[in-house]
Each structure stands twice: as structure tokens, then as C-alpha cells.
Amino acid sequence: MAKVNAFSKKIGWIELITGPMFAGKTAELIRRLHRLEYADVKYLVFKPKIDTRSIRNIQSRTGTSLPSVEVESAPEILNYIMSNSFNDETKVIGIDEVQFFDDRICEVANILAENGFVVIISGLDKNFKGEPFGPIAKLFTYADKITKLTAICNECGAEATHSLRKIDGKHADYNDDIVKIGCQEFYSAVCRHHHKVPNRPYLNSNSEEFIKFFKNKKRNKNI
């Protein structure tokens, strides 16, 4: 007889685990899913095919891993669940590297939750520019529970909230491609102060003026 718990009551919800690179997002997703095994709760993990760092599994930088189903797009998750390959006893759906999906993943997550599934999602909150990555801003709205993790700044040791990209030792330009699959060869975690993106545009006409004004004000105080 199946154990009675929150997952057996057909009440769905969405959990979002997010933060910069090297914050332990995938490790936290794996931890939450792995503990379900002790309560005999069935789960299934999906990941986007574009993430080629590991094949047919999600893997944290601490070495933990879980098998996963690779999909090209968010709607394929629903197709798989409707197929004969799906175990009808599955209560929890895990989704890793969610930033690589488009906005349709939001609808998929909502549909799953509305139909009794617990959906646990992990992914980057910001791209290398410091802007919302893919569907993440909308997922913040839809999620019932949000866990925002931090890493350690490579420059000063403070809490890191941003992912910095460097190519051949130089900061990536704002106009570079958003997606560049890689790890420590391109990326590091940094705090807000040490996050630099050359040629970043400003929406407000007086933003650059304010930045120059404030820098001069600080410089004059130090004289």
C-alpha cells in the first residue's frame, strides 16, 4: 500500500531553485528528489538537450547525479508524460537547466501543477549580462516556493549573485551570444560589485551621467 503524504493527495505545486553558476542549484534539485525515495514517491527528471555537459542525466559539480529524459522543447515534456514510457505512479517532475527552455515551459509547469504534479525546477536566474535568463522571470511569478541560492565571489569572497563570462581573459561583451555552454573555462561567480559587462546599454538617458557623477563624487572624497 502506498504511503499517505502530501504527494499522494493530488495537490500540485511548483518549486523554483535558482541563483548564479556554482551555487549548487542542480545539487539541491538532486537532494530534494533523492529524499523522495525514502517515502516511495516516484519522480522523473527532464533536461534540455542543449545542455551537453552530461548525457542522459543531470549531474552536480559535487558529483551527484540522477537519470534524466532529454527533450528539445518544453511541450515534449507533456508528450512524454502522455506516452507509454511514462510511469503513472510518478508524482514529482524535476526540470533542470530551465533557462534553456523558452516561455512555453511556464505553461507546461502550470499545467502539470494544476493536474496534481509537484514540479521542482532549477536553473540560472540571470545570464552573463545580469539580465533575466530565458523564462526565469515568469517562473518567479508562477512558482509557489522559491529558493534563491548564492555562490562565493571569485574576486572578493563575498556572496556571489552574478555569473561572469570571460573569453581569453577578457570580459564578454554585452552583444555576445547569450548561450555559451561551458563551465570554469568561461564562467565564474561574482558579487554585484565585480560583475562587469562592456558596452551594456542604458534605458534611461541620464543613467551614464549619474554613474560618472557618482564616481567623481567618490573620487573627490578620497582626495
Swiss-Prot record:
Zn(2+) binds at residues 153, 156, 191, 194. Keywords: ATP-binding, Cytoplasm, DNA synthesis, Kinase, Metal-binding, Nucleotide-binding, Transferase, Zinc. Its EC number is 2.7.1.21. Disulfide bonds: none annotated. GO terms for molecular function: ATP binding; thymidine kinase activity; zinc ion binding. One of its GO terms (cellular component) is cytosol. The active site is at residue 97. This is Thymidine kinase. It comes from Ureaplasma parvum serovar 3 (strain ATCC 700970).
